Each structure stands twice: as structure tokens, then as C-alpha cells.
């Protein structure tokens, strides 16, 4: 994984964990969990691409990797919508900056995962 992407994930996760969104803290914790899961999935796909011979290993380990890929894209879309919603309702500039960076990161990671998946197909 690109070192900038790693630091972006870590920075956004740290910033989100510091936010106090009142009654919606459960939602925020869910978003943080989704971000962490997405980070791990993106890393594993990237590693599989780096070892192109690993495609067969990936498919044999997880015969349903295409379904898993589809599920990850659904999670990304959900996170994008959730982040956009947060951007619309927040007036706190720290939160706005954090969610804008999170949105940018999600769009970049979605594109990277698409690129990786096409290389694996």
C-alpha cells in the first residue's frame, strides 16, 4: 500500500476517534470499524496483486472473492454516503475537514480496489 494512503487512513481514523458526535457516536464507531476493515481488505488485495501468482491462492482460499469484492464496493458506497451526510449536517470545521479528507480517501481507495480487482480477474 502506498505510504501516503497508509498515513491517510491512520490520520483519519485517529481524528474520527477523537470526535464527539453526541447521540450518533454509535454511527461514528461503525464508520471507524468500516474504515479499518476497508484498510485491511485494500492491503490484502494490494499484496495479492504484488504477487500476481497469488491469484490462484486467493481464489482457492476464498472461492467467493468476487462476492466479497462486491460487498466491499457496497461498503465503500455506504461510507461515501454516510460521510457526505455528515458533511452536510456538521458546522464544526475540524469535522468538516476530517470528513472531506475521508471522502477523498474513500474515492481514491475505491479506484485502487477497482484497479487491483481488474488485475486479478
UniProtKB/Swiss-Prot annotation:
It is found in: Virion; Host nucleus. The keyword tRNA processing does not apply. InterPro entries: Flu_NS2. One of its GO terms (cellular component) is host cell nucleus. The keyword tRNA processing does not apply. Keywords: Host nucleus, Host-virus interaction, Transport, Virion. One of its GO terms (biological process) is exit of virus from host cell nucleus through nuclear pore. SUPFAM superfamilies: Nonstructural protein ns2, Nep, M1-binding domain (SSF101156). A motif (Nuclear export signal) lies at residues 12-21, 85-94. Transmembrane segments: none annotated. Pfam families: Flu_NS2 (PF00601). HAMAP family: INFV_NEP (MF_04067). Mediates the nuclear export of encapsidated genomic RNAs (ribonucleoproteins, RNPs). Acts as an adapter between viral RNPs complexes and the nuclear export machinery of the cell. Possesses no intrinsic RNA-binding activity, but includes a C-terminal M1-binding domain. This domain is believed to allow recognition of RNPs bound to the protein M1. Average number present in a viral particle is estimated to be 130-200 molecules. Interacts with protein M1. May interact with host nucleoporin RAB/HRB and exportin XPO1/CRM1. Belongs to the influenza viruses NEP family. This is Nuclear export protein. It comes from Influenza A virus (strain A/Duck/England/1/1956 H11N6).
